[in-house]
């Protein structure tokens, strides 16, 4: 049943037009050989920059993907943490060697920087490890993390790297939009601009309000100037927007995927259906 569910998921990914899949510990539930079999049926590459096939001494899957979209060259690589195994006898580890993620990330950045404008890491390290990586390695623009399953509505910026997280259990979708206003590849989060604009409106209200004491107006005026200065610094810069939305029962299903799921459920009825997000 687990293998059939894996095949169903892969067929769905093919229909959705995936560009790449970063390997995580759940993908190894049925072992190395099954995952290699699945990769041959995928219409997109499986990525892992630090999982080695113990038999051959080579990478299990390709280390990175290069894509060009609207003239922008994008490099995508993937990291897996050996800490996610339960121990040396974990079945998922059989036949695999995991290279050090930090050393691998450094090597990937050196490899990708001359070839790309934007570097994205698909991380299966855990959120704390993503933070640590961003603090110690420069050159990665976005870390899209999984495993921890945190909803980061306001992705933190660590040095020059934004950290995003996949929400848990496939219950949410996410979308990232980039708006380029210049040919540099640094960004600010649109939520930062909205927050500053909201702050400026409130400060202006306080300055105009009759009940605001005169002794406080100098402080509010300084706050207004600081906020306007911060907004001015964003003008002309590149922007990204991060949207997370729940996949509710009322959302319309894709007819082909719905047919596949219904056929699977008729063969393997589940005792309980997961509750949709609220």
Whereabouts are the PLM-identified features?
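Acidic, metal/ion-coordinating pockets
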Residues: 1-278
């Amino acid at each position: 049943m687990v293998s059939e569910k894996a095949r169903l998921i892969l067929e769905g990914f093919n229909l959705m037009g995936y560009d790449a899949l970063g390997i995580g510990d759940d993908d190894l539930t049925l072992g190395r050989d099954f995952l290699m079999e699945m990769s041959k049926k995928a219409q997109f590459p499986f990525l892992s920059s630090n999982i080695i096939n113990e038999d051959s001494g080579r990478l299990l899957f390709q280390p990175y993907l290069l894509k060009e979209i609207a003239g922008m060259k994008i490099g995508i690589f993937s990291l897996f943490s050996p800490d996610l195994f339960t121990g040396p006898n974990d079945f998922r580890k059989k036949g695999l060697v995991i290279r050090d993620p930090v050393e691998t990330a450094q090597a990937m950045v050196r490899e990708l920087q001359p070839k790309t404008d934007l570097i994205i890491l698909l991380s299966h390290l855990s959120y704390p490890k993503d933070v640590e990586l961003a603090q110690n390695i420069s050159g990665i623009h976005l870390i899209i993390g999984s495993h921890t399953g945190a909803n980061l509505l306001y992705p933190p910026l660590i040095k020059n790297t934004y950290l995003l997280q996949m929400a848990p259990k496939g219950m949410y979708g996410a979308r990232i939009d980039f708006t380029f206003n210049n040919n540099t590849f640094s960004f600010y989060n649109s939520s930062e601009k909205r927050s500053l604009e909201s702050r400026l409106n409130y400060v202006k209200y306080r300055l105009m309000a009759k009940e605001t004491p005169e002794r406080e107006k100098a402080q509010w005026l300084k706050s207004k100037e600081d906020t306007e200065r911060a907004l001015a610094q964003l003008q002309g810069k590149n922007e990204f927007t991060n949207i997370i939305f729940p996949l509710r029962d009322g959302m319309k299903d894709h007819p082909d995927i719905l047919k596949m799921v219904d056929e699977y459920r008729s063969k393997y009825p589940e005792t309980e259906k997961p509750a949709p997000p609220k």
